């Protein structure tokens, strides 16, 4: 993590439980990020907060540290039963819930607190078996949590800490009725530590906070610009005919360490996967139709470096928190301005540099003026030499074909390879 992304506040200087400090030290957390430095002193006084912070700012560790510390320093309710978690963390997507649980397990190692996770798309009974053994901190999506509450599998009568993450996305996805349902089944707000985090503290988000929290203090870490200065943005104006060849040429030129390619439709994503796979890239496909187990496997492969490229729709990519994404390619400009910010925000995180490349094609170029107005600046235009685009592109792979997951860059088999390192190919020349 870049030091410029951190504050001067040390975790060790905060009044945290010794076991929390030990877990932070073991995982390399010494200095707080700005949102952690602002929110933890408030939360450690058992005061509620409504925090405004973008993804990639460290807000997840902020509320996890506060949650673990609160449970370790506050006695559990005397009448608590095995099916009653002490803390609940609600997330808008299963991918975000999985990431939160992964981070929570880093802190749970020395505390004796049990972490459980529930979300749709996975076996109801398998997740129930975990709950039946008892969990202290329950992480999940609202729909699956409600299922277990209604079935009497869990009770929220002993909740002592509540986290609502990405509240603005909860509104976007229509989950607010679910959230209010769950809040009404918890102890009074005055007997809980309540935390809400959102990229924007709109009036509807603030109303939710004040309805179900105890006079929360507003904590804001708002960037001066909607897009990070760490991200180099550029845009091309390709013809429909050139669009795919331009993407493949740029990806060969950039040779990104880890890239996400966004498109607006499932069909377009499948087409992109076919061409990228045919060209020898190690690529995963993430659309709404991909089964949950396969989604998890693809994300694990992408995170570990077994896949270099992820092709995704906006809906399928919501809630993803993957570090070290070097490049984002907007094959289609999104129809929603906020989606542009969310897309390119996958790179340039935690103080790292990132690159965003967008295509303003004949179909989606009309989306650009609204996007530029929303982000407050023009995206620099880059030009390409049509004659320099790749002309030896292999045939795309059919989507139903089972493709190998063990492919590597060196020695990968493809129509343009004869084995060994990738041979040199024509490249576009872009202005520096």
UniProtKB/Swiss-Prot annotation:
Compositional bias per record (Basic residues), positions renumbered to this chain: 423-432
GO BP annotations listed: RNA catabolic process
Helicase ATP-binding domain ranges (all copies): 40-219
Domain of life of the source: Bacteria
Claim: Cytoplasm is one of the keywords in the record: yes
Domain Helicase C-terminal: 243-390
Family matches, as NCBIfam families: PRK04837.1 (NF003419)
PANTHER family the UniProt entry points to: ATP-DEPENDENT RNA HELICASE RHLB, ATP-DEPENDENT RNA HELICASE RHLE-RELATED
Protein name, per record: ATP-dependent RNA helicase RhlB
Organism from which the protein derives: Shewanella denitrificans (strain OS217 / ATCC BAA-1090 / DSM 15013)
């Amino acid at each position: 993590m870049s030091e410029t992304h951190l504050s001067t506040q040390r975790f060790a200087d905060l009044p945290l439980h010794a076991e929390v400090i030990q877990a932070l030290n073991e995982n390399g957390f010494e200095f707080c990020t700005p949102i952690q430095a602002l929110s933890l002193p408030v939360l450690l006084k058992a005061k509620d907060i409504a925090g405004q912070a973008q993804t990639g700012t460290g807000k997840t560790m902020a509320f996890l540290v506060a949650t673990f510390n609160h449970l370790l320093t506050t006695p559990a309710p005397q009448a608590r039963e095995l099916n009653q978690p002490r803390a609940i963390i609600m997330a808008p997507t299963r991918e975000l819930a999985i990431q939160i649980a992964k981070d929570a397990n880093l802190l749970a190692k020395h505390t004796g607190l049990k972490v459980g996770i529930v979300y749709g798309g996975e076996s109801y009974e398998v997740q129930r078996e975990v709950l039946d053994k008892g969990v202290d901190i329950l992480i999940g999506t609202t729909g699956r949590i409600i299922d277990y509450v209604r079935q009497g599998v869990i009770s929220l009568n002993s909740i002592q800490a509540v986290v609502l993450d990405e509240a603005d996305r909860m509104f976007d996805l229509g989950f607010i009725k679910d959230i209010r349902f769950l809040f009404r089944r918890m102890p009074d707000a005055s007997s809980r530590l309540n935390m809400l985090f959102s990229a924007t503290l709109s009036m509807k988000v603030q109303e939710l906070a004040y309805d179900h929290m105890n006079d929360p203090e507003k904590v804001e870490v708002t960037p001066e610009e909607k897009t990070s200065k760490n991200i180099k943005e550029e845009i091309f104006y390709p013809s429909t005919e050139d669009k795919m060849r331009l993407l493949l040429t740029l990806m060969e030129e950039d040779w990104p360490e880890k890239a996400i390619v966004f498109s607006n439709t499932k069909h377009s994503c499948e087409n992109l996967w076919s061409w990228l796979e045919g060209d020898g890239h190690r690529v995963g496909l993430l659309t709404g139709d991909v089964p949950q187990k396969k989604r998890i496997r693809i994300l694990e492969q992408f995170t570990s470096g077994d896949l270099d490229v992820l092709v995704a729709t906006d809906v399928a990519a919501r809630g993803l928190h993957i570090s070290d994404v070097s490049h984002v390619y907007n094959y289609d400009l999104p129809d929603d301005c906020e989606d542009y910010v969310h897309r390119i925000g996958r790179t340039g995180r935690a103080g790292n540099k990132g690159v965003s490349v967008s295509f303003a094609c004949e179909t989606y170029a009309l989306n650009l003026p609204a996007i530029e107005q929303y982000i407050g600046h023009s995206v620099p235009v880059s030009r390409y030499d049509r004659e320099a685009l790749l002309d030896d592109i292999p045939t795309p792979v059919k989507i139903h074909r089972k493709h190998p997951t063990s492919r590597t860059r060196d020695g990968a088999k493809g129509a343009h390879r004869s084995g060994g390192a990738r041979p040199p190919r024509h490249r576009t020349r872009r202005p520096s």
